[in-house]
Amino acid sequence: MKITAEMIKDLRQKTHAGMKECHKALQQTEGNIEKAIVFLREKGIIKAAQKQGRATSEGITNIVFDGNNAFLYEINSETDFVSKNEHFQQLVKVLGEIILKNQLSNAKDLLAFNYQNKTVQELLLEKTSVLGENITLKRVLKVTKKPQESFGTYKHQGGRISVLVVLKNDCPSVSEDIAMHIAASKPQFLTPDKVDPTFLAEEKKILHKQTAKELSDKPAQMIEKIVENRLGKMLKDMCLSEQPFVKNADQKVKDYLKANNTDVVSYVRWEMGN
């Protein structure tokens, strides 16, 4: 398969690896970007955290509520300047009202919804003309809780990051603290037992190849033990329950929750552009 300059550019943006390394990775994986990323990680050229990449656009994430339902949505613009514009802010408000009133739970339904004799998609095109930048709706998500459960939220930088937490009971101060922690610490999973087995197996495979390369003179049993230790540390960093609480690094999140007689049922962390 021919490796094009565009393919190399795409892989470099995702991994920050060098041009030669990206070209080789693409050759080895027959042009498959995702497999090329894994190839680079196995070679130790990039770190796991870089796989997710960075935000590439501006805009706002927001959360609106209706009883036991919460709706998250993200609207994008090309620049931060426009996202702070009065017209853009009003658009965010209007879309939130439409979502709530009509209980719209995905972007497709919202874009097709008829509002004041035009679809929301047409409304976005109008705003694009007014603001001089491409304005898009990226995503919508509905989260429903049980009556005895409670919502907690935290917004950072006016909506660059929005976090929604569901606690098993009503603990306003705790839910706000946990939401703030999630915004700062970026957990990928709730608890170790909630980690996707496929993800775990892939991570272990990559760690094993990296470790075997670093310690090629060590016996297989020792390498396996080191891999298990590294995997355990990685899970502690990724799982909300195991992370050091942002307000008290000597206390794990799960211990903070236990001390307050509550627990996290679920959470959503959205970062604008990701």
UniProtKB/Swiss-Prot annotation:
UniProt-listed InterPro entries: EF-Ts_dimer_sf, Transl_elong_EFTs/EF1B, Transl_elong_EFTs/EF1B_dimer, Transl_elong_Ts_CS, UBA-like_sf
A Pfam entry, by short name: EF_TS
Gene3D superfamilies: 1.10.286.20, DNA helicase RuvA subunit, C-terminal domain (1.10.8.10), Elongation factor Ts, dimerisation domain (3.30.479.20)
GO CC terms: cytoplasm
SUPFAM superfamilies on file: Elongation factor Ts (EF-Ts), dimerisation domain (SSF54713), UBA-like (SSF46934)
Keyword match Protein biosynthesis: yes
Top-level taxon of origin: Bacteria
MF (Gene Ontology): translation elongation factor activity
Localization of this protein: Cytoplasm
Region annotated Involved in Mg(2+) ion dislocation from EF-Tu, chain positions: 79-82
Record key words, sorted: Cytoplasm, Elongation factor, Protein biosynthesis
PANTHER family in alphabetical order: ELONGATION FACTOR TS (PTHR11741), ELONGATION FACTOR TS, MITOCHONDRIAL (PTHR11741:SF0)
Annotated family: Belongs to the EF-Ts family.
NCBIfam families: tsf
Function: Associates with the EF-Tu.GDP complex and induces the exchange of GDP to GTP. It remains bound to the aminoacyl-tRNA.EF-Tu.GTP complex up to the GTP hydrolysis stage on the ribosome.
Protein name as annotated: Elongation factor Ts
Organism listed in the record: Onion yellows phytoplasma (strain OY-M)
Gene from which the chain derives: tsf
